[in-house]
UniProtKB/Swiss-Prot annotation:
Subcellular location(s) of the protein: Cell membrane
Coiled-coil region(s): none
Protein name in the entry: Uncharacterized MFS-type transporter MT0042
Cellular component GO terms held in the UniProt record: plasma membrane
GO molecular function: transmembrane transporter activity
Transmembrane region(s): 68-88, 110-130, 131-151, 164-184, 194-214, 229-246, 260-280, 287-307, 337-357, 384-404, 412-432
Keywords: Cell membrane, Membrane, Transmembrane, Transmembrane helix, Transport
Signal peptide: none
Pfam family, one: MFS_1
Membrane topology note: Multi-pass membrane protein
Family recorded in the similarity comment: Belongs to the major facilitator superfamily.
Amino acid sequence: MPRVEVGLVIHSRMHARAPVDVWRSVRSLPDFWRLLQVRVASQFGDGLFQAGLAGALLFNPDRAADPMAIAGAFAVLFLPYSLLGPFAGALMDRWDRRWVLVGANTGRLALIAGVGTILAVGAGDVPLLVGALVANGLARFVASGLSAALPHVVPREQVVTMNSVAIASGAVSAFLGANFMLLPRWLLGSGDEGASAIVFLVAIPVSIALLWSLRFGPRVLGPDDTERAIHGSAVYAVVTGLLHGARTVVQLPTVAAGLSGLAAHRMVVGINSLLILLLVRHVTARAVGGLGTALLFFAATGLGAFLANVLTPTAIRRWGRYATANGALAAAATIQVAAAGLLVPVMVVCGFLLGVAGQVVKLCADSAMQMDVDDALRGHVFAVQDALFWVSYILSITVAAALIPEHGHAPVFVLFGSAIYLAGLVVHTIVGRRGQPVIGR
């Protein structure tokens, strides 16, 4: 018995020291530490920008609120993540990623000023959405560059852990940015003037991200000039980005399996997002209250994703990427059924649990791309992931918006989401089985 007690004490101390050990590992990698700081500043700005626009577009009585209008707003806000992904990947695999970060953040500052001005003068939805479209496109370049650069600043054996640290830090920053939006909205109102002030505030974290991007040396973030790199003109590299990325995905079953599971999760996220937005608009008379309830749901989902960032590295080491992702997809299919009653408190809890499961699937896919793909093509593959990530999301929202009633009471769509998870599990199981064992799997 004493031997067991001593073992338990040692085991507990090891777990207690784990965060300290991770922190020391982060600080021992100076370039990763700098990259992490850029991510934190950039994603705080992203969260603030997206929440400010959501308040202006979706919780403003002077603007559209029906399901198709909500779907259209989401499509415009996130279209850059799907359309520009292949081009971002091609440029990142050809240009110094430091200058991609610098250039994209500089462009973001200009667009932030433009969008803030559009809101300040009370212009219509079209110029506002066009400005948001371009601003989000530039934000996509930054996010893709940060992900593709990570293996350059982290030893291979630490990629999974440090990727989780990076994603967790970014998620927390985006969450804080989105919730910080509530303060100026409360002080200045929920109209266009308040939204304009929020957008102008985004310039602060983006400026910090820009300045911190300048601290890297030439080619520190990649890409490598390997023999597999795509040569020729820059135009050729941009145009062929998606083709090369897709071909690489097809050739690597571990990557293809991960992306299939991720696509299934994103389709369900789209359905659930539309349902919760319609439900809170229907049951809450005040737009501010509706926005707060919606933010609570998305915050719970983000908190679940944060927890997954902590748990996933251990799960992958114990069971491998393949089994871990399969388990997460199976759990998600079960959790989704519990939300069929469309009770908002229950949906918030399910959102938290689905945030855990979905982020586990994404991290498994990320580790496959970061460890199984040559650096010269990694940016292209991440671009394919970005495109799939957002196309599946936008398509599911659009299809659901055409069928879901305005009050949002459509439990059959919740059950359909569970079926999508099961389909993703089947595809992941079949495709992933073809993959050859690799280090870290």
